[in-house]
């Protein structure tokens, strides 16, 4: 991932490097909760319903406490019957956010933060990118996650 834009002093040009070969897709699936580090799963292709269901069963379900609320946006794979059943079987309550409301979803702030930091690193190779994602996940401050939840709740009260 590379930065798309740059700044320079007035009258001077910005120069930089960027690979021009084709790139590979790396998708992230994740979950956050108060007081704990994020759970993230990587995929070397687009995420479909089967991969998301695997994430829910393997990573999310063991992490859920009875009565937890699992907040999801309106992506079609989130609304699959098998996903909903897996969340309910784990003892949680699925909550779907209104359409076009990423400001209410605290994990969107994690993705924005990770993308910004990954662009700053300007990594070229896929293994480097995957290692960086793991490092960034581990380095995510728990206090920052709490702030993301507070901000999303404040947005919900405004609406």
Go through the PLM ranges and name each one:
Residues 12-20, 89-106:
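RNase H-like polynucleotidyl transferase catalytic core
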Residues 1-5, 83, 107-109:
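Short aromatic-enriched loop/helix-cap "lid" or pocket-rim segments at secondary-structure transitions
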Residues 53-95:
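RNase H-like DDE/DDD metal-dependent nuclease/strand-transfer catalytic core used by mobile genetic elements
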Residues 25, 73-74, 95-119:
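RNase H-like two-metal-ion nuclease catalytic core shared by retroviral integrases
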Residues 6-10, 88-89, 113-115:
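Short, hinge-like loop/turn segments at secondary-structure boundaries
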Residues 1-58, 153-156:
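Extended, low-complexity cationic-aromatic segments
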């Amino acid at each position: 991932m590379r930065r798309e834009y740059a700044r320079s002093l007035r009258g001077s040009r910005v120069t930089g490097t960027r690979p021009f070969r084709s790139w590979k897709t790396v998708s992230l699936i994740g979950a956050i909760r108060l007081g704990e580090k994020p759970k993230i799963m990587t995929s070397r292709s687009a995420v479909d319903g089967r991969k998301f269901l695997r994430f829910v069963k393997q990573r999310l379900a063991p992490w859920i406490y009875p009565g937890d609320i699992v907040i999801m946006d309106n992506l079609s794979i989130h609304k699959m019957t098998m996903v909903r059943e897996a969340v309910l079987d784990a003892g949680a309550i699925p909550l779907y956010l209104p359409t076009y409301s990423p400001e209410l979803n605290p994990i969107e702030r994690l993705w924005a933060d990770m993308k910004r930091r990954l662009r700053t690193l300007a990594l070229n190779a896929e293994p480097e990118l995957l290692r960086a994602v793991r490092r960034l996940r581990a380095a995510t401050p728990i206090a920052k996650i709490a702030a993301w939840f507070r901000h999303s709740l404040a947005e919900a009260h405004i609406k």
